Amino acid sequence: MKLPFAESYKIKVVENLRKSSREEREKWIKEAKYNLFNLQSQQVFIDLLTDSGTGAMSDMQWSELMKGDESYAGASSYYKLKEKIREILGFEYFLPTHQGRAAENVLFSVLVKENDVVPGNSHFDTTKGHIEFRKASAVDCTIDEAFDTQVEHPFKGNIDLKKLEEVLKNNPKEKIPFVVVTLTCNSSGGQPVSMQNIKDVHQLAKKYGVRVLFDSARFAENAYFIKIREEGYQNVSIKDIVREMYQYTDMMTMSSKKDAIVNMGGFIGIKEEEIFRQASTFNIMFEGFITYGGMSGRDMNALAQGLDEGTEFDYLETRIKQVAYLGEKLDSYGVPVQKPYGGHAIFVDANKFLPNLPREEFRAQTLAVELYLEAGVRGVEIGTLLADRDPQTRENRYPELELLRLAIPRRVYTNNHMDVIAAALKNVYDRRSEITKGFKIVREAPIMRHFTVELERA
């Protein structure tokens, strides 16, 4: 008999969860202005808002916390992290930052100017926000298959080379600071980019004299999918795949709170000394001295250990199979989700779930609120609220995909929790015809509004 799959870890510490009544949840979500970011954590039973910084660190990571060097300059923890980044990712120069958006802020302060054009694969919210804050434009060049949730394409994060070349041809290279490759592509459903596409994008960018930047938050999950899905990589280790991937970029930004499995931290990897020197000035201004950059020594130690653990096959297999378990459950219930299942989250297709709800009433946000009311499960909208308004017209931008993201924290929940999530969504799906009203905006920020938006029933 073939042995069943089991997790590659055992549980050493637990945290109690509190269940709540529907009446309590109705009160709490109304007080939160129907914005799930405004809920207190104790008002949530299963928290799938994000996989960023919410994972469980290992005993080895906890032991590294005790060995952190908190020297202001030249801490040994910095050099430990520097060596680990060089070993795994191959960057000679790096700058620590407190998280991924800080890495973007520092690097984009050097490279992105007004009226620039930044092509890539479905830039995530902070990436697009930092670009548009600088009065530049983000151009989505993702393949069309990414926008049909039922198409089984193994690499829906791929960049369409024709779309990319159109941007590169029609704009002077001085106006294109870099091409962004997001690994994996969060906004299209945690979808990976193939090694071949990475190579092709790099070659095309170099043809036009443009740099390549990897948004690397989930780079290890991307490497796992290359190993599993791309011909010729089945017998290659995750670390070797990662090293090959990073031959084809000039720079990287990293939110370490994802694939390095820490609660806080990020960094920039740079291959050109001059960009490193310019970025160092902004790092000192915004983050801190270049050998800590907003991170404590103990956090740098835990991050170095996490980079090792996060690029191990057994860990990645356990993590991604749990995400797939939830996807398969939902699929068996008829709930429409992005296929194939992503690396860090399941993305529910709100357009197919609530097709009769006017898109102006925020389908994915409505679905997120309904799931919370049903079972105390907190997901997040990846749709019209997140897309923000057009900077010129101030009209809503309606993305091709309107998704409810269920991001699974690493090494935190069991499959019993996945069963609860799936059953709750099935219950909402069974009564979807009764959901006829969504939300309207009461108050919003001019950029990245989804974090603080206030809503009321339409």
What function would you assign to each model-found segment?
Residues S255, Y341, I382-L385:
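Acidic carboxylate-rich catalytic motifs and surrounding loops in phosphoryl-/glycosyl-chemistry enzymes
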Residues G310, E374, L386-A458:
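PLP-dependent enzyme catalytic core of the Aspartate aminotransferase-like
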Residues I275-R277, P355-R363, R411-V420:
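Short, conserved charged micro-motifs
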Residues S137-D140, I270-Q278, R298, L373-E400:
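Flexible glycine/proline-rich, aromatic-decorated loop/lid segments
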Residues V323, N351-R378, Q392-P399:
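Active-site loop ensemble at the mouth of alpha/beta enzyme cores that anchors a bound cofactor
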Residues K2-L36, Q40-G55, Q61, E70-F94, ...:
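Conserved PLP-enzyme active-site core in the AAT-like
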Residues V323-A324, Q338-D349:
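Conserved glycine-rich beta-strand-loop-beta hairpin in the small C-terminal domain of fold type I
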